[in-house]
């Protein structure tokens, strides 16, 4: 039984060395209690049923049953918060795990790096606090949140963004799932480019871009220095760099400061889009912890652009979007399921038109 008041943890990994490393990290913290270890997905399923841990750390490549199958079985029977702890080589598969119900993805920490260990522990604490629900066994598309409540649309705050506009999106915890649902719901190329800053562990952005590209009707790619923005394309910022858009509408990547808390910076991206696109800038702030992106939404709002925010009911973490809403920088607060239609409207597309 876990100690009272502590987060009970089940570690799932076929590597004894990896399990020992994770156990050591958790045992150094006062608020975690490792209750069991499993060497494959099949063992993990049985242990979850009997122990009901507060957190499962899940590897992906294991004998007998891998992490993907185990996650799907756990989330459709005895749902618990699952944090995928994976190597960068499994990045695309790791994001596939999120479509099966895993809460988040993190790289296996280097125990010689105090910063990596601290980031890992903070992520584990956050994931353990996120409510999860049992989900259907079969998913044909990423979950798009609850059924939207009909609302009368407010008058547009800016002209259609399709001609010279840029959509800039800020996201953190829960963002990969939200982005997947949003892109799937848009379902067609937009008439302007989309740039995205999603907080993510180093090395995983490329895998996330590949995963989103498999879902989206628009090409999704990892942003590259000097690349010119193209309408109907989604550009994802690497975590190791802060992305911005230049006056000539090219991508600029600046090496992030070592002690930067949020990686990559949402504020840097959104602020640059406000400066470049002005009234035709569209800022979207999705689910996530912290305040990164709030200043960027302020910049877009003050430039006369259009600002959208994901509502509390469809957010995994109502944090950065909540702050932007409270400060008055979000003109339209919408459930995740309504954001796609709003973006189609803003960019001048007809929601009912064929692609």
UniProtKB/Swiss-Prot annotation:
Residues of the active site: 172, 199, 292
A GO biological-process term: chemotaxis
Residue ranges constituting the Response regulatory domain according to the UniProt record: 8-123
UniProt-listed Enzyme Commission number(s): 3.1.1.61, 3.5.1.44
Catalysed reaction, written as an equation: [protein]-L-glutamate 5-O-methyl ester + H2O = L-glutamyl-[protein] + methanol + H(+); L-glutaminyl-[protein] + H2O = L-glutamyl-[protein] + NH4(+)
Major subcellular location class: cytoplasm
Entry similarity comment: Belongs to the CheB family.
Free-text note on domains in this protein's UniProt record: Contains a C-terminal catalytic domain, and an N-terminal region which modulates catalytic activity.
Protein name, as recorded: Protein-glutamate methylesterase/protein-glutamine glutaminase 3
Record gene name: cheB3
């Amino acid at each position: 039984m876990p100690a009272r008041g502590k987060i009970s943890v089940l570690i799932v990994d076929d590597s004894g060395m990896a399990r020992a490393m994770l156990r050591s990290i958790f045992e150094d913290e006062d608020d975690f209690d490792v209750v069991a270890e499993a060497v494959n997905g099949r063992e993990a399923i049985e242990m979850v049923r009997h122990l009901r841990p507060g957190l499962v750390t899940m590897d992906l490549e294991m004998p007998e049953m891998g992490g993907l199958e185990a996650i799907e079985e756990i989330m459709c029977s005895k749902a618990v918060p699952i944090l995928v702890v994976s190597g960068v080589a499994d990045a695309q598969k790791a994001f596939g795990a999120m479509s099966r119900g895993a809460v988040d993805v993190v790289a296996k920490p280097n125990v010689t790096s105090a910063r990596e260990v601290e980031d890992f522990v903070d992520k584990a604490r956050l994931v353990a606090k996120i409510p999860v629900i049992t989900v259907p066994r079969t998913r044909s598309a990423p979950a798009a949140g609850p059924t939207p409540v009909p609302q009368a649309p407010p008058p547009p705050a800016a002209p259609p963004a399709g001609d010279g506009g840029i959509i800039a999106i800020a996201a953190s915890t829960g963002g990969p799932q939200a982005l997947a649902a949003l892109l799937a719901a848009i379902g067609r190329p937009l008439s302007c480019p989309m740039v995205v800053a999603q907080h993510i562990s180093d090395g995983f952005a490329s895998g996330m871009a590949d995963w989103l590209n498999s879902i989206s009707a628009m090409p999704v790619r990892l942003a590259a220095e000097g690349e010119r923005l193209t309408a109907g394309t989604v550009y994802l910022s690497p975590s190791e760099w802060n992305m911005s858009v230049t006056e000539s509408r090219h991508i600029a990547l600046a090496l992030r400061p070592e002690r930067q808390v949020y990686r990559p910076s949402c504020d840097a991206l959104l602020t640059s889009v406000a400066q470049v696109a002005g009234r035709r800038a569209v800022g979207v702030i999705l689910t996530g912890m912290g305040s990164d992106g709030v200043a960027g939404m302020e910049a877009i709002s003050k430039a006369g652009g259009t600002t959208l925010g994901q509502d509390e009911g469809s957010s995994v973490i109502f944090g950065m979007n909540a702050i932007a809403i409270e400060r008055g920088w979000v003109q339209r607060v919408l459930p995740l399921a309504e954001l796609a239609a709003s973006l189609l409207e803003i960019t001048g597309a007809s929601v009912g038109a064929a692609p």
